[in-house]
Amino acid sequence: KFKLRNLERVAITINYTSAPEIPTVHMGSRTTSYIMKGVTNAHSNFAKAFRENHWYNISGIDVYTMSNNMSAIAIIGNSITDGKCSTDNAQNRWPDVMSEMLQLKHKITNQGVLNLGIGNNRVTVPGGFGALAKERFDRDILMQSGVKKVVIFEGVNDIGAARSGSSETVARKIIESIQGMVKKAKARKMKVY
């Protein structure tokens, strides 16, 4: 149990008895991970650690509160959401800025922002990174705790990957898939943007 303030950054330490053969990785996290041999904790000297600008092994963190009025805005997207062109360790991806604006400028302190962006992700055209947005929507959006609002910010990579002459077909498939995501979210009383 930790007492956290709004917008507070959290560091996570994981100790393994042996390294995973195939670790999960978030290549575009734009946040430094520190990797060391042996048991580590908050008091370890991370100056000697191997540094890598990726996240490993964490699929999510649930934050529990005593308030009944808390909720989350979940954003499904591609590299633009994931943080492409943001600054390493600055936490200035557009969902980070959105969260700060809601909290600091608009005084909306009861909503968290969940960034479910994956670089080069696509809605319907295979070949990008991660599961297609239409396939990961249930897991990445609908199964998140406390989500009341959803932002769908996907499709540009499908358009870019479309073969010549197939743009109308790709556009139709994107629209149909996003409409399916909207229908699922609305069935759970979520507001969709």
What are these model-predicted stretches?
Residues 65-70, 100-109:
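Secondary-structure boundary elements
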